[in-house]
A protein has these predicted regions:
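Short beta-strand element of Class I
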Residues: 42-46
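C-terminal substrate-binding/active-site "lid" region of AdoMet-derived donor-dependent transferases
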Residues: 103-165
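Conserved class I S-adenosyl-L-methionine
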Residues: 19-28
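S-adenosyl-L-methionine
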Residues: 48-89
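Active-site segment flanking the S-adenosylmethionine/decSAM binding pocket
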Residues: 72-115
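Conserved SAM-binding loop of SAM-dependent methyltransferases across substrates and taxa
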Residues: 29-41
């Protein structure tokens, strides 16, 4: 599950206030899809996930939070999706990162937003190099590291979480 702070940053970078369709690649149990659906009830969300256990939990979460605007697509991206998107979130690449970036750029409307999160430095490097190779301008890259207050004996300390890399970029053009 995408942690709350990472999810908030990713959703902000997706600029969903101007979107009508979001694709969530590697949706997992649906934390990003559910949060987006709750914040933007008019948004259509395509959640792609390959893991059967995660798909079951994703469907349970969709029902629990009454998010009828989430369509669940079992399988592996890239896949055929008829409708282009205004925003794509990639929370996992399954080892096909450059293929997924290429597919995302084809699947996005002009001026559409792509946001990706990584925990591995190698995936960050591959993504940045590939976006540069594609000529994508204005790539925004952040490292987010959040610490949470925890108890230690009779005292408290901030327990660090692992850092997460967030890349946000925009497809060239203007969406009408």
């Amino acid at each position: 599950m995408t942690k709350e702070a990472v999810r908030a940053l990713a959703l902000s970078k997706l600029e969903l206030h101007r979107a009508s369709h979001l694709i969530d690649i590697g949706a997992g149990t649906g934390s990003v899809s559910i949060e987006a659906a709750l914040q933007y009830p008019g948004l259509r969300i395509t959640a792609i996930e390959r893991n059967p256990d995660a798909l079951r939990l994703l469907d349970e979460n969709r029902q629990h939070f009454a998010c009828a605007n989430i369509g669940i697509f079992p399988g592996i991206a890239p896949m055929t999706i008829a409708e282009k998107a205004d925003a794509i979130f990639m929370g996992g690449s399954g080892g096909h990162l450059t293929d997924l970036i290429d597919w995302s750029m084809r699947q996005l409307h002009p001026a559409g937003r792509l946001v990706m999160t990584f925990i591995l430095q190698e995936n960050l490097n591959i993504a940045l190099a590939h976006l540069d190779h594609l000529g994508i301008q204005g790539v925004d890259c952040l490292q987010l590291q959040v610490s949470s207050l925890a108890t230690l004996g009779s005292g408290h300390y901030f327990k660090p979480n692992n850092p997460v890399f967030v890349i946000a970029c925009q497809k060239e053009g203007t969406h009408v």
